Structure formats: structure tokens, C-alpha cells
Curated annotation (Swiss-Prot):
Domain of life: Bacteria
Organism annotation: Maricaulis maris (strain MCS10) (Caulobacter maris)
Name by which UniProt lists this protein: Threonine--tRNA ligase
Subunit relationships: Homodimer.
Family, as annotated: Belongs to the class-II aminoacyl-tRNA synthetase family.
Organism lineage: Bacteria, Pseudomonadati, Pseudomonadota, Alphaproteobacteria, Maricaulales
Cofactor: Zn(2+)
SMART domains with a match to the protein in the record: tRNA_SAD
TM region(s), chain numbering: none
Gene Ontology terms describing biological process: threonyl-tRNA aminoacylation
InterPro entries: aa-tRNA-synt_IIb, aa-tRNA-synth_II, aa-tRNA-synth_II/BPL/LPL, Anticodon-bd, Anticodon-bd_dom_sf, Beta-grasp_dom_sf, TGS, TGS-like
Residues of the TGS domain: 1-61
GO molecular function, one term: ATP binding
Amino acid sequence: MINVTLPDGSKRELPDGASPLDLAADISKSLAKAAIIATVDGQDWDLKRPLDGDAQVAIITRKDDKALEVIRHDTAHILAQAVQDLFPGTQVTIGPAIEDGFYYDFARSEPFTPEDFEAIEKRMGEIVDADLPFEREVWDRNDAIAKFEEMGEAYKAELIRDLPEDETITIYRQGEWFDLCLGPHLPSTGKIGKAFKLMKVAGAYWRGDHRNAMLQRIYGTAWADDKQLKAHLHRIEEAEKRDHRKLGKQMELFHFQEEAQGQVFWHPNGWRLYRTVTSYMRRRLEAAGYVEIRTPQLMDRKFWEASGHWDKYRENMFISSIDQEEKVLAVKPMNCPCHVQVFNQGQKSYRDLPLRMAEFGSCHRYEPSGSLHGLMRVRGFVQDDAHIFCTSDQITAEVSDFCELLKSVYADFGFEEPRIKFSDRPEQRVGSDEVWDQAEASLKAAAEASGLDYEYNPGDGAFYGPKLDFVVKDAIGREWQTGTIQCDFNLPERLDASFIGDDSEKHRPVMLHRAILGSLERFLGVLIESYAGKLPFWLAPRQVVIATITSDADGYAEEVKAAMVKAGLHAETDLRNEKINYKVREHSVGKVPVIAVVGRKEAEDGTLALRFLGEGGKTQEILSLADAIARLSEDAKAPDLKRV
């Protein structure tokens, strides 16, 4: 007999050879019907696969979060079968589940077309209707290689050859079609449903290496039901409307070009927005006791070797060699080692701690050209970076103060309370396990003492220390990781940072790496998309456009502009010989929050007809120039200045 322990701690006895499906049926008929896979001792498991012995078992139904990943993985298999049914000779490679969907990479000489998508989706539906069982088979390694080579599936044969010699080779079959796969899968293709859609095709190098063959990657999305699918497609439609790259053109904020891939050309409007955000952050940091510094862009290779970046981060760094001096320099990918150098200048006492150093530091990291995406993923960026040098006893208070500052900043930008993730040691790291134990325990204790509700994200810490990441949700429900605080006992040791304690002995400081906005470029992209370009008045790069109805009001428009600029507003005039409705429409597309319409009457009366973005330009408010300036000046104040 097999003894099975359920998630609630209760136990059941099953006969030898029983499967999770037998367990589900033993519990209830409804559970057996709803079950799709199981977890056995924490490992995902096919419902019909026999249990090896006593185990802890959880039955997973379609309502569980884990279900979507399996549904998407199964849909990728169905996509691959459909493609090979319709386009004989196409080779299959890999096809995993990803966030919100799945993809499969194909080797085919002819490109896929939108018309092909219709045929593929139809065939996928037929495979679902056929309700083919997913069957797990264990093959001999050499037999598997020979079979795939015989079929002309060179990529699958290569994958098997690269597996460890003792790896179990598992094949999943659906009808006559089969694929190399670890599993698990649903009981049959009919269990998947038809809440899927193919989205796009893109190029992808085999195994992500540009030296390998270019494949065709078909992306799709799959959900538990049609309602979820429709909601996802609506979110995509909304996201396309809010795309910061499109809005960046409409609002004349920035552009990119091939000669500087992944680096931003900021236009006057965009740079004004950028400076508004950095000015706000400088005020908040100064009020919180930070000092601002500036550090070099290029540092000698020896420096990065000492910090550990050369070994752990080399592939992401831009390198420059100077033949005349036989030196190898690297553009900094991070600011932290440079901040230690500032700390190391002059002897520090425990009375100097905590020392909070901030820098709007320019960093450069190599990203493959195919992964670049507007402001969201760039090669050159600025971080609102800061490092807190403190004692172990000060960690809790510093983490708590930082979290309060971060939440206040996010609220000022219109974001609700962030979701928090705790990430511990990654596989690639520096420092001993003892040091990591201390860092993880310190950060956890600080988070718990601060009353933070966090979720565990194993193995995703920085290479030098554990971290808390902060995730904000935008107006259409998408999540963005922005802020972070990381606890580092390693870098002060590697770069010989020290202070004199109250015992007159040398001690190592703890280094807290922290950012609130993260990459400013990315944060601005998130802001633009969350507000769909309709930024709060204090952030708007073009706050007021004074648009004339006739040339008779040109002089008055210039007077209005001068008065507004003097009051600290950003105001422009539009004196073109165009109809007023045309002007209003054009500036509305450019997301100008206030359009002040002036004609002969307004000039005579000393008034303005104000039209506000978002009200369709259908209503307007008549105010005197003085009242308009008073009202708009108050609206233009940043949230922190309103609290003064």
C-alpha cells in the first residue's frame, strides 16, 4: 500500500501502482473530474502517472494558479502538431509556456503569414476536439536520438545529446504526434479548451545565439476560459493605445535611432518631464538625509575585478581598450563600487553612520538588440541610485525609513501600495554562505520589523546580496518592478570599506543598495503608459498652450504667456492662421492638459477660455488672467511642495 499525505495534513491509503487520479477519485467524483495535474513531493506530476511510493500529494484543478502554465504548455504542443500537420518538413525545436502565453520555435524556409495563422488555429481546434490522450513514455537515449534523426528533427536530436548521460528521456505523445518533453500535461487535448489565440511571429536564433540558425517563433496566448482570453485581448488593445513609443512621438518627448541602439534622444518636452521628476526626487532625498555625489563613467578593469563585477557581470559590460596605455576600461553597469570609493576617502567613525549617498548615476549595460523596447529596455540609463552605509544595528531602521519614503513617492506619482518580493541567494554569487546567511537574516528581520507583507522569490537575489523588490501596478493592471533595496555584506569586504567603532577598532559597514524609481527611463515609460500620456498637471511638459482665434489676439496671447512663465508655468502660444478647433484637436492629441483660447473678446476683457484635456474640449471655463494663473500655479506644484 501507498501512504499519501494531503495538503491539509490528512492521510489516505492507496494500492501500489495508484496514480494521483485514483487519489482524486477516492476523495470525490467532482475532484477527479476537475483535476488536471498533481504535485508529488513538490514535483509536477501527470494525473495518470503511477506514484513511486509514499508521498505528499496535491491535486491541481483548473482554478489553481499553476493550471495556466500547464494549459499554455499543452497549447504549445498542439501548435507544434498543427504546424507539422499543415506544413510537412517543418522542424520543431522548443516551445515553453511564458508569461500570459506560450511560443514555439520552428525551422522552416518559408515565412509564416497571417493567413497561415487562421489555418493553424483551425487545425489546433480540431486537435482539441479530437480529445487525444497525452501519454508519457520513457525512451532509451540512443533510440530517441536515432528516431528524431530519422524524422529529420536535427534540433531535437541535438537537445537529447546535450542532456546529461543519466537524464531520463521522456516523450509525450498525443495521437500519432510526439515531442521530447519533461511534462507534465493534462489528461488529454480536449481538457485544454479553445481559449487560445496566436498573436505574432518573430525571428529567434536557435538557443538565443546569433551564431546559430534563425528560426521562426510563433507566439500565442492561452487561458482557462473565453472570459479570461477576452479580458487579456482587451488589455493588449489598451496597452497598444498607451504605447509610450507612440505617445512619445505625439507628445514630442524622445526618439531612438539605429546609430545609438538602446539609447534615448530626449527632446525639449521629454527632457522637461525628465528634469521635473529628478528635481522632485532630489528634494525628497535631501529631506530624507541623503547627500548627492557624482562618480566616473569609465573605470579600469582591475577595479571591476576587485568588486566581483568582472567575473559575474562581464557579459553585460561595455569594454574599451586603450592600446597606447595597454589598459582595459569598462563603462560602469552599476554605481555601487564607485560609491564605496567615495566612502573610503578619509577615516569614518560610527558617529558618521548611517551615511546615505545618492547619485543619479548614468549606467550602461549590454542588452541584445532584439530585446530592446523603447524606454522600457535600453542600454544607457540613469538610476535614482543610493547606498546607505550603516551598522548591523541600523539595518532595520534604515529599511523601514526607506520603505516609508518609497511608498510616499509612489503615491505622489499615482501608484497604489506596491507588491513586495523577497529574493535570496542566486546560483551565481560572491561571498561565503555564512555571509549570505547573515545578510538574508538581517534583511528578513528588517522587513518583518517594518511590518512588510512580502512574498518569497527564491534564487533571484543580486550576485552580492539578498533584496526586496517593489512592484507597482499601472492603470490597466500591468505590474512593473521598479524599486529595490539590497543588503550587502560582500562589497564592503571586497573593497576594504571600514569605520572606527565605539570600541576604537575597525569594522566593516553594511551596505544597503536602494532605488525607488529604478531606471528613470523605464519609470517614465511606465508613467506615460499608465496615464495614457495625460500626465498630472505638475508633470506635464507642456502645461498650457494659449491658442488664438484671430490675429487680433496675438499681442494679448504673448502677454498671457509672459505672465504664466513668470508665475513658473510652462506656457506656449499658438498664433498660426488655423481654425481654433484644429488647434484644440492638435494639442489634445499632444496631451496638453490646458488650452487657453483667446480671441478679441478675451483680449478686451482680460480673460481666458480654458479647455481641459479629458473633457473633449466641449466645455470651457472663463476666468480672469489673474484667477487662471492662481489656479494653475497651485495645480503645477509638485505633491511634496503642496505639503510644505
